[in-house]
């Protein structure tokens, strides 16, 4: 299946449901498809991004060195561990907990940033926690010029190429 995500008549992204969920092309798509932590970052080099004051390995490449980017991390892709865990990338304090039926939704304050985290394990409000974000949980997007806006050239070119391919298939 192929999905086209549009905003006010403009194509934002074309792709499979999995591609759109896992690799949103802009802030609008990331918010449209589900809850996300969207953070400002700097792409240091291929496979390395800096956000929240530290460098994280990631699986993205093809960005310019030191390019400002938007970093998307889904709430279910963040692991909370003991604050003493030496593998923790970040440390924070649980500000609130909301039971959502199949999981808990936590708001965790990490310095000046509040992360939304989903987990099936309960942690009490006020608890200090460690945060682990693995490379494949980090999704990098080109920085939007304006909030929730994208240069539509890429999406339009993709749609045009798909339509041309369909016409060629019909001609053969």
Predicted feature locations:
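C-terminal boundary and immediately downstream tail of ABC-type ATPase nucleotide-binding domains
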Residues: 22-43, 72
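Glutamine-centric residue-chemistry signal
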Residues: 12-13
